[in-house]
Amino acid sequence: MSYQQQQCKQPCQPPPVCPPKKCPEPCPHPQCPEPCPPPKCPEPCPEPCPPPSYQQKCPPVQPPPPCQQKCPPKSK
């Protein structure tokens, strides 16, 4: 006997009793959400990158030393 034939010999089961169909309930009115929370302050900006190291090594520019040589007075 094949599997299908065995299935055929089993007594039929009564169809399940479906519950009576309910009309779908109308959608409830959308409720206003809670008031918006105050906007979060953005994270503080990250510190700007330090200047590249080669800029830090430069000595500050100094004015040239005053001339030691005494110039002769200009003739008019």
Swiss-Prot record:
Expressed in uterus. Its main location: cytoplasm. Residues 21-47 are annotated as: 3 X 9 AA approximate tandem repeats. GO terms for cellular component: cornified envelope; cytoplasm. The keyword Magnesium does not apply. One of its GO terms (biological process) is keratinization. Sequence repeats lie at residues 21-29, 30-38, 39-47. Keywords: Cytoplasm, Keratinization, Repeat. Cross-linked envelope protein of keratinocytes. It is a keratinocyte protein that first appears in the cell cytosol, but ultimately becomes cross-linked to membrane proteins by transglutaminase. All that results in the formation of an insoluble envelope beneath the plasma membrane. This is Small proline-rich protein 2E.
